[in-house]
Amino acid sequence: MLGTLGAGLSNFPWLSASILFPIGSAFVIPFFPDKGDGKEVRWFALSIALITFLITVGSYINGFDISNENVQLKENISWLPDLGLTWSVGADGMSMPLILLTSFITALAVLAAWPVKFKPKLFFFLILVMDGGQIAVFAVQDMLLFFLTWELELIPVYLLLAIWGGKNRQYAATKFIIYTAGSSIFILLAALAMGFYGTEIPNFEFSHLAAQDFSQKFQILCYVGLLIAFGVKLPIVPLHTWLPDAHGEATAPVHMLLAGILLKMGGYALLRFNAQLLPVAHAQFAPLLIVLGVVNIIYAALTSFAQRNLKRKIAYSSISHMGFVLIGIGSFSSLGTSGAMLQMVSHGLIGASLFFLVGATYDRTKTLKLDEMSGVGQKMRIMFALWTACSLASLALPGMSGFVSELMVFTGFVTDEVYTLPFRVVMASLAAIGVILTPIYLLSMLREIFFGKENPKLIEERKLIDAEPREVYIIACLLLPIIGIGLYPRLVTESYIASINNLVDRDLTAIKSAAKANIFSGTKKNDILKAPTI
């Protein structure tokens, strides 16, 4: 009987359920009565988000083999055969950690949204639709379906910004949709080009595209378009300007979803498409990714240091930390690429915690200007402790997840011999500047908020209260995996190391083939990148 139950669980459509359950449940919300403060809707949304999280955990426990590098939990249903479109979902080591992260952060974001009283039905409807849509982005195995789910996620974010944002919410929401929807056209063009390549019958499945022998020029064209599209979402400097504006106007739960999940979609897509499906082009553009990663780290760290708005300071900090993802993806090292994956998970947790605290602090002080915040530590001691713990995690304190992921990226890049020694030394030295700046701007931020001379107007008028049990619980739920991963990173790395090794081997083979074909001859890349001995 137990064997039958186990077989049934392994055959259960876990991923389809985790995608369709929150989206389908969201359409129940309009039938809730409009009277009251939305208490029933909040509890319903929280229940659905928690069940979705349990479904994703069930998919990992019952159907996912961490030693298998291939796609698992595969579901393939013909949807629109004339267009070559199938409902194809699955998970490998690169997608499963992010699926779990998405459902986990969303459940906490629903709890963070407990104070929302304005249009609660629409708010939680959008959150649940966003939950299913973001899981779908990481789970789909069809490139055209990937484009559709990528676009589906944009609509809830736009509405959450435009309706519940700050005074400049319309500008921020419009800028977000122009940047992200506008750049998404490159995903559609690349999907159509790759799906129709060499055939009149389109096939958009990842497995088919990975087996295709795309020409070098074709790969380069697709790579550039996809780099722009995914670079907007990551974001890569100078395609980043929508993010500080979006974070500057968003509410705390939307902050958590933006920083915790949305940015990771860009990093995941770069791994899945640029590095995995276009290896020859990746061999040529990887040095550029390294340079862009270093620019992200330094530029965003310096800009964060200069910000006087708390939300924008943390937003630029996020951009800086995502630079390590770019370096890891371009490193051609199993350790470096593994570090990029871990950095996405780590920053998802840390970014969500910091932005939640930004929202909680604003709810009390009603200001985001650091010049108006000072001396509130005496009134909010628990809040100060929470801020300190999350800031230490963000500055990569040993024993926390950020330290491990950044160390893996640095070590993987510096010790790998694919790049020449001078290039590695210069890039690592420049990136280290950003690492040094991080504790400076974060610790100075803590000092300005919680220490110094008290602002009498702020203290007297706002009647500041300390952290509530709900807020402590949310931060505790985020800090637990942050510390757990920091102390024992194999909790996460074991789930994707087989897939990462397979990806890196594929890219190293592409470098060797490119060198034999003299692709780098006549360019300066051969002074940076050299063919490995495989």
From Swiss-Prot:
Ranges annotated as spanning the membrane: 12-32, 44-64, 96-116, 120-140, 144-164, 176-196, 220-240, 251-271, 285-305, 314-334, 340-360, 384-404, 425-445, 472-492
Chief subcellular location: membrane
GO cellular-component term (any): plasma membrane-derived thylakoid membrane
Molecular-function annotations in GO: NADH dehydrogenase (ubiquinone) activity; ubiquinone binding
Keyword terms: Membrane, NAD, NADP, Plastoquinone, Quinone, Thylakoid, Translocase, Transmembrane, Transmembrane helix
GO biological process, one term: ATP synthesis coupled electron transport
EC number(s) stated in the UniProt entry for this protein: 7.1.1.-
Pfam family of the protein (one): Proton_antipo_M
Localization of this protein: Cellular thylakoid membrane
Reaction(s) catalysed by this chain's protein: a plastoquinone + NADH + (n+1) H(+)(in) = a plastoquinol + NAD(+) + n H(+)(out); a plastoquinone + NADPH + (n+1) H(+)(in) = a plastoquinol + NADP(+) + n H(+)(out)
Keyword Translocase found: yes
Topological relation to the membrane, as annotated: Multi-pass membrane protein
Function: NDH-1 shuttles electrons from NAD(P)H, via FMN and iron-sulfur (Fe-S) centers, to quinones in the respiratory chain. The immediate electron acceptor for the enzyme in this species is believed to be plastoquinone. Couples the redox reaction to proton translocation (for every two electrons transferred, four hydrogen ions are translocated across the cytoplasmic membrane), and thus conserves the redox energy in a proton gradient.
Assigned protein family: Belongs to the complex I subunit 4 family.
UniProt-recorded name of the protein: NAD(P)H-quinone oxidoreductase chain 4
Organism, scientific name: Prochlorococcus marinus (strain AS9601)
Gene: ndhD
